[in-house]
Amino acid sequence: HYYDDTDEEERIVSTVDARGHRPLDKKREEA
């Protein structure tokens, strides 16, 4: 882990938001 939990979470959210989907929302849609 080279990132703090906050930094990593923000990095993931930023990537997902760029595609127009949030991690939780995407999981709910695919579930």
UniProtKB/Swiss-Prot annotation:
One of its GO terms (biological process) is blood coagulation. The modification Sulfotyrosine is found at Y2, Y3. The keyword Coiled coil applies. Its main location: secreted. Keywords: Adaptive immunity, Blood coagulation, Coiled coil, Disulfide bond, Hemostasis, Immunity, Innate immunity, Secreted, Sulfation. Residues 1-10 have a biased composition (Acidic residues). The keyword Chaperone does not apply. It is found in: Secreted. Conversion of fibrinogen to fibrin is triggered by thrombin, which cleaves fibrinopeptides A and B from alpha and beta chains, and thus exposes the N-terminal polymerization sites responsible for the formation of the soft clot. Residues 1-31 are annotated as: Disordered. Residues 18-31 have a biased composition (Basic and acidic residues). One of its GO terms (cellular component) is extracellular region. A long coiled coil structure formed by 3 polypeptide chains connects the central nodule to the C-terminal domains (distal nodules). The long C-terminal ends of the alpha chains fold back, contributing a fourth strand to the coiled coil structure. Cleaved by the protease thrombin to yield monomers which, together with fibrinogen alpha (FGA) and fibrinogen gamma (FGG), polymerize to form an insoluble fibrin matrix. Fibrin has a major function in hemostasis as one of the primary components of blood clots. In addition, functions during the early stages of wound repair to stabilize the lesion and guide cell migration during re-epithelialization. Was originally thought to be essential for platelet aggregation, based on in vitro studies using anticoagulated blood. Heterohexamer; disulfide linked. Contains 2 sets of 3 non-identical chains (alpha, beta and gamma). The 2 heterotrimers are in head to head conformation with the N-termini in a small central domain. This is Fibrinogen beta chain. It comes from Canis lupus familiaris. The gene is FGB.
